[in-house]
Amino acid sequence: MTDQHLEDLIVHIVTPLVDHPDDIRVIREETDQKIALRLSVHKSDTGKVIGKQGRTAKAIRTAVFAAGVQSSKKVQFEIFD
């Protein structure tokens, strides 16, 4: 799965969870050893993406890591305001 597919996967997972899908942004920073994907959503949607006790965020992170296994680079995923 390519980097762009990882970004598309994140958007696909997060879109049904938020009230402001137009404010979803996935920023990719890539180095020789890792791919860092940072998710930004509307301020009022942050809690929905994180979920109770971080369960939703953990599930998204697990899906992204599983999809990124084919890459030779380490995948890092963060949610920020």
Curated annotation (Swiss-Prot):
Location of this chain's protein in the cell: Cytoplasm
Name of the protein described by the UniProt record: RNA-binding protein KhpA
Gene3D superfamilies linked to this entry: 3.30.300.20
GO biological process, one term: regulation of cell shape
Domain KH span(s) in chain numbering: 34-81
GO annotations of cellular component type: cytoplasm
Assembly with partners or alone: Forms a complex with KhpB.
Coiled coil segments of this chain: none
Organism: Bacillus subtilis (strain 168)
Protein's job: A probable RNA chaperone. Forms a complex with KhpB which binds to cellular RNA and controls its expression. Plays a role in peptidoglycan (PG) homeostasis and cell length regulation.
UniProtKB keywords: Cell shape, Cell wall biogenesis/degradation, Chaperone, Cytoplasm, RNA-binding
Main location: cytoplasm
HAMAP family reported for this sequence: KhpA
GO MF annotation list: RNA binding
Record carries keyword Cell wall biogenesis/degradation: yes
Highest taxon, organism lineage: Bacteria
Family: Belongs to the KhpA RNA-binding protein family.
